[in-house]
Design a protein with these regions (language model features):
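Conserved NTP-donor binding/palm subdomain of two-metal-ion nucleotidyltransferases/polymerases, i.e.
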Residues: 2-129, 135-358
């Protein structure tokens, strides 16, 4: 077990067989070929975890590009075709909603998969389980009321009690709405870790308008705001440091697509500055360290050194453990620290005696 594997044991990080898959997807040609053989011996495709399954379309493209032979080729091609159709259907259902919002004067910023699709160059290789968008906090209450009238039902755990929308918005960062097989995740804060009213100010300032289209339709698409590269990588990494019930590992190729697209031109000082401003050094440093040590990602060592958490750093480490551990494994103290970290980011002050753990 590598040092990084021991460091992440018991948390949300990719398991041994998932790391093999990631080496196929993200390593050089020679390493990819060896890793593919080992991965095929290690997994039973009939029982594969959801996180790995989501990357089968990307694996199809990778083995095709490298000319690798695998008995799984027909299944991988089928997974790619299925994902292509699913993503098409999702965008056809959701983009008209976003277009209506922009026509009504609501600024809409694409997050997560929707913001990353163009970087993959193919709508069929990157999974989209939903469409995540960010709107200004002031617009969110009206949109949360309007979506149900248009046939979108709130997820059971996201529906605020009547008249309690403000309470809902103060407690979390987003709400999901479903219609048929499509889902929109409406965000008023880009990250669950930072609910402060001004937390996304620089994200909005650095974003740029760009058309988001459905390939093959010939239409002009919908003009949305897209995050700057620095903000997109921060979102990908912080989200990747959270536990997920599906053992999601899509964040790894997402991050590497961004880093390899920009190479030496990537603005590392801006990324470090944003992480410090939002007190998110711990999850960013841990994910970047994983990418560097496991997959030889072009992450400079001085960047990791610059991401030391500021005092009281125990709060942010405890928050990291609370968010990256499976439910029931985080301690009460870790969960309390996660809430304290949100309070500090929102401009609050810690109670007396919280500068160091007791």
């Amino acid at each position: 077990m590598s040092a990084i594997s021991r460091r992440h044991a018991g948390l949300c990080w990719p398991r041994a067989h998932q790391r093999l898959l990631l080496r196929v997807l993200c390593g050089d040609a020679d390493r990819a070929s060896v890793a593919l053989e080992k991965w095929q011996q290690a997994v039973d495709l009939a029982r594969i975890d959801a996180g790995s399954l989501a990357l089968m379309p990307l694996l199809h493209r990778r083995v095709s590009e490298l000319g690798l032979r695998t008995p799984l080729a027909p299944l991988l091609k089928g997974a790619y075709r299925w994902r292509w159709c699913e993503n098409q259907l999702l965008l056809r259902e959701t983009l008209p909603v976003l277009a209506r919002w922009t026509t009504e004067g609501v600024p809409v910023l694409a997050l997560k998969g929707l913001a990353l699709l163009r970087r993959y160059g193919n709508i069929g290789v990157r999974p989209l389980s939903d469409v995540d968008v960010l709107v200004p906090r002031s617009h969110a209450p009206a949109l949360m009321r309007a979506l149900p009238t248009a046939g979108w039902r709130a997820r059971a755990d996201d529906a605020p009690p009547p008249g309690r929308t403000d309470d809902r918005m103060a407690a979390t960062h987003a709400a999901g709405f479903i219609r048929g097989r499509a889902e929109i995740d409406l965000h008023w804060a880009s990250l669950a870790e930072d609910l402060s009213p001004g937390g996304d100010e620089r994200l909005w300032q650095r974003s740029a308008a760009a058309p988001v289209t459905i390939p093959g339709t010939g239409g002009p698409g919908v003009s949305l705001r897209l995050p700057a590269t620095v903000d997109l990588l921060l979102q990908v990494c912080v989200h990747g440091a959270r536990w997920s019930r599906t053992s999601a590992i899509t964040w790894v190729p997402d991050a590497l697509v961004i880093l390899r697209e920009h190479g030496a031109a990537f603005d590392w000082p801006a990324l470090v500055a944003e992480a410090r401003a939002r007190r998110l050094q711990v999850p960013l440093a841990e994910t970047l360290r994983f990418l560097r040590e496991e997959l030889d990602a072009p992450v400079p060592a001085h960047v990791l050194a610059a991401l030391d958490a500021e005092a009281p750093d125990w709060i942010y480490w405890s928050e990291y453990f609370a968010r990256s551990a499976a439910p029931g494994r985080a301690t009460t103290a870790d969960r309390a620290a996660a809430r304290l970290a949100q309070i500090v980011r929102a401009g609050g002050t810690l109670p007396a005696g919280f500068s160091e753990p007791s």
